[in-house]
């Protein structure tokens, strides 16, 4: 390319810059902290093309799965007679709320207190203290403890 045409091209670019105008006073953002916090950007809700699971997971700990069996030893019978307390072997994953709800659902009795322990055989045992308006002996007979 000839030197004269190059000068013409530069002149045209300079003319365009003058007509357009240029920002001369760009204000710098003064940062007062040494830490940079990433700005919050727009987070859109997910709209998947298809569901990742074909069916929702079922509840594995229903009332029948929580309570495995009644515990029928002499000490358990003494608890029934003396302390109005039923003793059950329950699922290891069940907590006290699950046990209380399961006893109410299966046997229609109100539990006041639930104590749990894990036996050396790695079974969970639940001591369910019944409300004073229920008799543990009657409930045990109805269930089939005795």
From Swiss-Prot:
Domain of life: Eukaryota
Alphabetized GO MF terms: rRNA binding; structural constituent of ribosome
Start and end residues of each stretch annotated as Disordered: 1-22
Signal sequence range: none
GO BP field: translation
Cellular component terms per the entry's GO annotation: cytosolic large ribosomal subunit
Keywords noted in UniProt: Ribonucleoprotein, Ribosomal protein, RNA-binding, rRNA-binding
Record flagged with keyword Cytoplasm: no
InterPro entries: Nucleotide-bd_a/b_plait_sf, Ribosomal_uL23, Ribosomal_uL23-like, Ribosomal_uL23/eL15/eS24_sf, Ribosomal_uL23_CS, Ribosomal_uL23_N
Keyword rRNA-binding carried by entry: yes
Family matches, as HAMAP family: Ribosomal_uL23_A
Similarity-based family: Belongs to the universal ribosomal protein uL23 family.
Function of the molecule: This protein binds to a specific region on the 26S rRNA.
Protein name, UniProt field: Large ribosomal subunit protein uL23B
Organism: Caenorhabditis elegans
Gene name of the encoded protein: rpl-23A.2
């Amino acid at each position: 390319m000839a030197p004269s045409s190059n000068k013409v091209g530069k002149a045209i670019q300079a003319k365009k810059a003058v007509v357009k105008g240029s920002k001369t006073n760009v204000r710098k953002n003064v940062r007062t902290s040494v830490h940079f916090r990433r700005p919050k950007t727009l987070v859109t809700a997910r709209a998947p093309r298809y569901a990742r699971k074909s069916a929702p997971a079922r509840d594995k700990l229903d009332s029948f799965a929580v309570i495995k069996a009644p515990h029928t030893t002499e000490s358990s019978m003494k608890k029934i007679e003396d302390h109005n307390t039923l003793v059950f072997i329950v699922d290891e994953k069940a907590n006290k709320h699950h046990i209380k709800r399961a006893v109410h659902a299966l046997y229609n009795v109100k539990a006041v207190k639930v104590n749990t322990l894990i036996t050396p055989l790695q079974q969970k045992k639940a001591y369910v203290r019944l409300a004073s308006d229920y008799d543990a002996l009657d409930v045990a007979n109805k269930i089939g403890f005795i």
